[in-house]
Amino acid sequence: MITDIKKRALHRARILEGQLRGVEKMIDDEAYCVDIITQTLAIQKSLRSLNKLLVENHLRTHVTEMFDEGGSRRDDALDELLTVFELENRA
């Protein structure tokens, strides 16, 4: 994994961990539902941010290598890109 992206992804994952603990506490404390929903929507945004970093890393490393190899590896890279695109559109 690219060092800078890894650092940013770990930072984002740690933020998410804290946000999830916060939601758990809010539920346990029976916080106002809209406040909990607001926090869960923030978590979804954070997850999208993490996913963007992971996709960027994959494109800059694995996909680039697969394209450079050519042939069936290039086709595999395209298949992976389509899969990621489809997964993103389902979310």
Locate each region found by the language model.
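Solvent-exposed interaction patches of small proteins and small membrane subunits
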Residues: 1-91
